[in-house]
């Protein structure tokens, strides 16, 4: 997709950030309740700092804009972004936990998110979270998110670390009923990297985030493609966060492997993986205008939408800044800023008018 002559960016155009993380200020202390230190806990200190701890160790500092809906609206207004599609922080997935314990946390997060979306309907849409370690409970909570809480879908991790120490990739047969339910409900599914592969061997230089995250997204996309999940569920609406990680950028290698060793690669789906670039959605946060241009040319402007990873340091600090550096005509801008997002979410633009 090569854009026509660049036109001035319309500041009045609706802008929707599809990748924005959100937490309540406080959540149930399941580490204390169940004696399991792996559950994340929040500590608010006397000097005004807010820190998440996991396994008794510092994990991440967060700020009031992580949970204050009006502060977030005001922050986004500086960049003419009106709408945030909020999802939890992946450390909250807790797929390793007992399913009922994880469900307790997920329901609290989903209830809080839904209340924000109800209170600020012109500024928020929501993607809940579900305990994928129990597909039955995941489907149950997905249905509650969509039918009762009126959220637009759910965010899931790039793989599932199970309570017994095993794990499922997204092609696991056990997970197919969840994806089938999402397709039947018309729910949007956001796949986000978490629990990055190789983290134990990459203790320095922030490598799990810089190297592991793109690899996680490629693993997840390849499993959805090669496992036949997308082929069997043509109505399934999946967006790969972080621009799909390395998947779109290594599709040539992936396709070559498919062609040269179908005995290894095409065991569950006989179709060329390249064709699924037009089945998946991707957010725009690739941190480089040349990379975004490649993503648009390879996947199509109709498959890409604004996403920032707000409010974290690795995210886009000025929402839409990379998009603004790519020559696009106004219809193409409209697709990236809101058209693709509305299609993925199944919402009319009037929802945010």
Q: Residue locations for each model-derived region?
A:
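Mid-to-C-terminal alpha-helical segments outside catalytic/metal-binding sites
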Residues: 7-18, 25-83, 111-119, 140-144, ...
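Aromatic-lined glycan-binding groove of carbohydrate-active enzymes
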Residues: 226-228, 234-277
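Hydrophobic faces of well-ordered beta-strands that scaffold small-molecule active sites
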Residues: 16-18, 84-86, 125-128, 154-156, ...
């Amino acid at each position: 997709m090569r854009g026509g002559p660049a036109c001035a960016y319309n500041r009045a155009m609706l802008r929707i950030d599809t990748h924005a993380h959100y937490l309540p200020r406080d959540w149930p202390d399941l580490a204390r309740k169940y004696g399991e230190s792996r559950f994340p806990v929040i500590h608010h200190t006397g000097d005004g700092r807010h820190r998440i701890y996991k396994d008794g160790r510092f994990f991440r500092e967060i700020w009031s804009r992580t949970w204050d809906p009006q502060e977030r609206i005001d922050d986004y207004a500086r960049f003419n972004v009106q709408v945030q599609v909020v999802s939890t922080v992946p450390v909250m997935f807790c797929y390793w936990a007992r399913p009922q314990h994880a469900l307790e946390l997920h329901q609290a997060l989903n209830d809080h998110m839904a209340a924000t979306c109800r209170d600020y309907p012109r500024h928020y849409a929501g993607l809940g979270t579900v305990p994928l370690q129990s597909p039955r409970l995941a489907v149950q909570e997905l249905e509650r998110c969509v039918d009762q809480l009126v959220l637009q879908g759910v965010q899931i991790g790039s793989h599932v670390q199970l309570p017994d120490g095993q794990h499922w990739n997204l092609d696991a047969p056990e997970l197919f009923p969840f994806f089938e339910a999402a397709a039947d409900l018309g729910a949007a599914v956001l796949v986000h990297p978490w629990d990055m592969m190789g983290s134990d061997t990459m203790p320095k230089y922030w490598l799990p985030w810089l190297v592991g995250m793109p690899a996680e997204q490629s693993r997840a996309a390849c499993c959805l493609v090669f496992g036949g999940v997308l082929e069997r569920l043509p109505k399934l609406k999946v967006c790969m966060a972080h621009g799909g990680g390395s998947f779109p950028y290594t599709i040539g290698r992936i396709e070559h492997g498919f062609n040269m060793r179908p005995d290894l690669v095409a065991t569950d789906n006989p179709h060329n993986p390249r064709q699924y670039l037009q089945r998946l959605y991707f957010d725009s946060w690739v941190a480089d205008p040349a990379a975004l241009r490649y993503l648009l040319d390879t996947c199509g402007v109709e498959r890409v939408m604004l996403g920032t990873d707000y409010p974290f340091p690795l995210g886009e600090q000025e929402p839409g800044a990379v998009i603004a550096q790519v020559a696009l005509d106004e219809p193409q801008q409209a697709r990236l800023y809101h058209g693709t997002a509305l299609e993925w979410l199944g919402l009319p633009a009037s929802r945010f008018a």
